[in-house]
Amino acid sequence: MSDIAEKLQVSTVTVSKALAGKEGVSEELRIKIQQLAEEMGYRKKIGKSDSISEYCNIGVIISGQYIEKGHSFYWTLYERILYHLSMIGCLGILEIVSEVSEQKMQLPRIAQEGRVDGIILMGSFPDQFRSMLANSGIPFVILDSFHAKYKQDSVISDGYYGMYTVVQHLLQMGHRRITFVGTVGATASITDRYYGYCRAMMEAGITVTDDMVLPDRDENNSITLSLDSIRQMPTAFACNCDNTAYQLLTFLKERGIRVPQDVSVTGFDNFIVSELSSPGITTYGVDVDAMARESVAQLLRRLKTPDASLQHIIVSGSLMLRDSVQRVL
């Protein structure tokens, strides 16, 4: 796509719109672009009557800030996406977007070069980046992030009721001083989980104050923990994710605070660290396979029916009870 744009001295966005049959391109220029694309052997896009499995390439875009050393939640999610794509004969192409690319508003290469028919955008990205991708003309689905102002299909885990369920369990175990661990506003997922925490606490007649919320990450999205802002030690910490819960366990152990004897800790996601840690972390299990499956189904639906109504799918999970929570007498 970038080669076509260079030859005709137009933007890749213009080329993408012309090839996708979208508005904003004159008929004369559209014909030139389509003719040159045919001459250069550009692969045609999927149409309503086409068989998707014949030549469907799907891009998966992840922000570099979410990719940690070794395994992470998003790596597991990506593996399941590849599985579900392979089951229908489609190919998944991964692109990790660097912080510099986000800041400079650089369109991902797989979009610039026209290598994909559609994109699964994993996690939170700046609004301007999302708008830029939308203007490229390539259909995409947002996975693990949602905002009503976004006019794209989306698939998210049930962070709100998931955290509500976790805190309800802590309350049933006799806990009242429960601190939420997560930087509210850092991501849509953390914010949803915070609201679920607030609802459970409010229903129990407990007012949530600022000192009951413990931030867990810095501006680079690295997990950083400190108890300095807590006026009174809680009996339980409800963490926004398992990685934070695991690091909190380590943080507490280093300071001689026992889990669950002195304080209880819960996580969210049911990532592998929640099982391997000592003690095992009580958490909310996100149905990663269902999220991957739904995101693929959503995107294929959009490719086959471009004018279909927007869909926002919430995938439920379940509470996973382990050894990091103790009843308060």
Predicted segments, located by residue:
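Short acidic capping loops at alpha-helix termini that bridge into adjacent secondary structure
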Residues: 176-177, 208-212, 259-264
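N-terminal helix-turn-helix/winged-helix DNA-binding helices
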Residues: 37-73
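Hinge/beta->alpha junction and helix N-cap segments in small-molecule ligand-binding domains
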Residues: 63-76, 94-102, 155-165, 181-225, ...
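Flexible loop/hinge segments that line or gate small-molecule binding clefts
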Residues: 122-162, 243, 269-281
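N-terminal helix-turn-helix DNA-binding module of bacterial transcription factors
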Residues: 1-52
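Short, well-structured alpha-helical segments in soluble
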Residues: 102-116, 220-233
